């Protein structure tokens, strides 16, 4: 072997990475040594997993407690008709194993909760959050921020999506600096009631995967401190700054020390 222990097949598979000065053999080796947890194997999780695996991220975890439904197939592109009724983590694992034998896949067929997230974070360097509910989003933010684990966030509805990255730096910012608490239950529709354009999660999920890859490489400028809003109907991107809040209950000066102080299944309030 040569080129930092990449074998002949890997040199061929990742050749378009390796010829880039910004990546090269050393960068590809960093990707192969990286471990990333993807929360959710649905609309956002599909492109996230697809591109992390193709890039050669060596260890990928998938956390999801759902099964494939036929209504998922319009946007959840790693699953097919034969997968209907199967656990999404199993379908996703098989997709990745067909795509890239270099990747070790760990499946976690469970809903991510305050009882298990800390153990999950211990196993991975980076988190990419493709969850579809506020409770999980706030939990991921709080747990990752307190543990110092960087994560990429994405959300979608109808024609619109949002995406950002939080590098879990001391002093923030974090998701709660922008949105201190979740909206009241029932005030914001979800994809099941309001719908979602089938291609939308592809765009947002690919940006999330890009952020995960850059974090693993240690190259480029992430969206830390910025949130991008994408409107597929108008084909526009807008960006806002996310400023650290000194009074943020998570990353602020007097922030909490444990996720167990939060009522995630209610309002995510602290």
Task: Annotate each language-model stretch with its function.
Residues 2-270:
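Adenine nucleotide-associated cytosolic modules
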């Amino acid at each position: 072997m040569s080129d930092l222990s990449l074998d002949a097949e890997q040199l061929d598979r990742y050749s378009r990475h390796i010829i880039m000065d910004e990546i090269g053999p050393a960068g590809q080796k960093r990707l192969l040594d990286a471990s990333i947890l993807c929360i959710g194997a649905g609309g956002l999780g599909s492109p996230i997993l697809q591109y992390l695996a193709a890039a050669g991220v060596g260890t990928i975890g998938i956390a999801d407690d759902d099964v494939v439904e036929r209504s998922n197939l319009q946007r959840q592109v790693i699953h097919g008709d034969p997968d209907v009724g199967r656990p999404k983590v199993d379908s996703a694992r098989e997709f990745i194993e067909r795509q890239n034998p270099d990747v070790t896949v760990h499946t976690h067929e469970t809903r991510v909760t305050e009882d298990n997230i800390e153990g999950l974070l211990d196993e991975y360097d980076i988190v990419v959050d493709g969850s579809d509910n506020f409770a999980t989003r706030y939990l991921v933010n709080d747990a990752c921020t307190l543990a110092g684990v960087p994560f990429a966030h994405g959300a979608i509805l109808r024609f619109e999506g949002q995406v950002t990255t939080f590098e879990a730096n001391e002093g923030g910012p974090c998701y709660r600096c922008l949105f201190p608490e979740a909206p009241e239950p029932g005030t914001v529709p979800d994809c099941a009631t309001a719908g979602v354009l089938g291609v939308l999660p592809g765009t947002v999920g690919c940006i999330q995967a890009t952020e995960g890859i850059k974090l693993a490489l240690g190259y480029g400028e992430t969206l830390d401190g910025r949130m991008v809003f994408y409107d597929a109907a108008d084909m526009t991107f807008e960006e806002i700054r996310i400023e650290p809040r000194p009074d943020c209950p998570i990353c602020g000066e007097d922030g909490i020390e444990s996720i167990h102080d939060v009522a995630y299944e209610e309002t995510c309030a602290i």
